[in-house]
Amino acid sequence: MKSELDSCRVEPALEVLVGRWKLSILYFLFHGTKRFSELQKGIPSITKKMLTSQLRELEEQHIIRRVVYPVVPPKVEYSMTEYGKTLEPILELMHKWGSDHVKYMQLNRNSQVTNNVME
């Protein structure tokens, strides 16, 4: 007999998206093809090792495409696959929810401070 967790399809989605930097990487790639150095500049806190690791995982999941050009110096570009582009509406909703959540928390933090002062 299947448990409710067995039928939960959120888990496979989270396996693809969870990673400290994956959502930031996807955000930049939804705005166009990027080179490694462009991604690193866009996410200054990420190390080269971590960026490489996160890019590899996304590539293995067919979310992004890595293209190596046979030139000197080496040129590598990353872009969204057609399959990866199906995540865009989900990420847009997550972005909106995150923005709303920040505003909500700020409002509630301010009212909490006001309540504490009045006590």
Locate each region found by the language model.
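Residues within the DNA-recognition helix of helix-turn-helix
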Residues: 54
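N-terminal helix-turn-helix DNA-binding core of bacterial DNA-binding proteins
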Residues: 8-50, 70, 74-77
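Basic, amphipathic "hinge/linker" alpha-helix immediately C-terminal to the N-terminal HTH DNA-binding motif
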Residues: 70-93
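N-terminal amphipathic alpha-helix
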Residues: 1-20, 93-94, 98-102
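Alpha-helical DNA-recognition elements
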Residues: 57
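Short beta-strand "wing" residues that participate in macromolecule-binding interfaces
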Residues: 66
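Glycine-centered, phosphate/nucleic-acid-interacting loop/turn motifs that mediate DNA/RNA or nucleotide
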Residues: 62
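Amphipathic alpha-helical dimerization/coiled-coil segments
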Residues: 27, 85-119
